[in-house]
């Protein structure tokens, strides 16, 4: 590369970054691709916004049944731009779910789930389930009346499953009733387990798309 900087040359010598850049920028895009094929990318952007704003809120949120609600109130009223951070988190969560639904419809209607892209579709379905679980666990974290009763209802649903139902309810709640253990588990799921799971499946999803390319028109 003519007139390259010493820094660029240093990285190029060790990592061959120009080959990587050429591969990324020269990928063929089929002529039938339109704006509706951007819905998956928009969903990713929403997730990144969720990650950034959620990380910011962890500095102030206290995952205890006695302090959760007051810590959220403090974030909204006393922390500089705290109301904006939480509002963006909520808005982007709603937008992420909407974009995900539209993305699934687009893929289904254009046949993007067919051979040889079955695994890409399966990873997408798994990510959709994780996204719904994100919503359920996040909804409970303020630990207000709405959050408490939502947790009580949702965590009680597995009780209808034969044999293992009661065990699953106790596993979700951390005991026989909804309380501190429940909030701790939902907080851990929402801020650690699910983000990592979603990131892993996203990586698999993108690598398969990268390998197989965008599906053709109907």
Curated annotation (Swiss-Prot):
GO cellular-component term (any): plasma membrane-derived thylakoid membrane
Known cofactor(s): heme b; heme c
PROSITE patterns xref list: CYTB_NTER (PS51002)
Residues bound to heme b 2: 89, 190
Residues reported to bind heme b 1: 103, 205
Biological process (GO), any one: photosynthesis
Record localization: Cellular thylakoid membrane
Record keywords, A-Z: Electron transport, Heme, Iron, Membrane, Metal-binding, Photosynthesis, Thylakoid, Transmembrane, Transmembrane helix, Transport
Entry binding sites for heme c: 38
Classification via SUPFAM superfamilies: Transmembrane di-heme cytochromes (SSF81342)
A Pfam family hit: Cytochrome_B
UniProt-recorded Gene Ontology molecular function terms: electron transporter, transferring electrons within cytochrome b6/f complex of photosystem II activity; metal ion binding; oxidoreductase activity
Cysteine disulfide links: none
Positions of transmembrane segments: 35-55, 93-113, 119-139, 189-209
Co-factor binding details: Binds 2 heme b groups non-covalently with two histidine residues as axial ligands.
Membrane topology: Multi-pass membrane protein
Location, primary (coarse class): membrane
Other observations noted: Heme 1 (or BH or b566) is high-potential and absorbs at about 566 nm, and heme 2 (or BL or b562) is low-potential and absorbs at about 562 nm.
Subunit structure: The 4 large subunits of the cytochrome b6-f complex are cytochrome b6, subunit IV (17 kDa polypeptide, PetD), cytochrome f and the Rieske protein, while the 4 small subunits are PetG, PetL, PetM and PetN. The complex functions as a dimer.
Family annotation (NCBIfam families): PRK03735.1
Function: Component of the cytochrome b6-f complex, which mediates electron transfer between photosystem II (PSII) and photosystem I (PSI), cyclic electron flow around PSI, and state transitions.
Record-stated family: Belongs to the cytochrome b family. PetB subfamily.
Protein name: Cytochrome b6
Organism: Prochlorococcus marinus (strain NATL2A)
Gene name per UniProt: petB
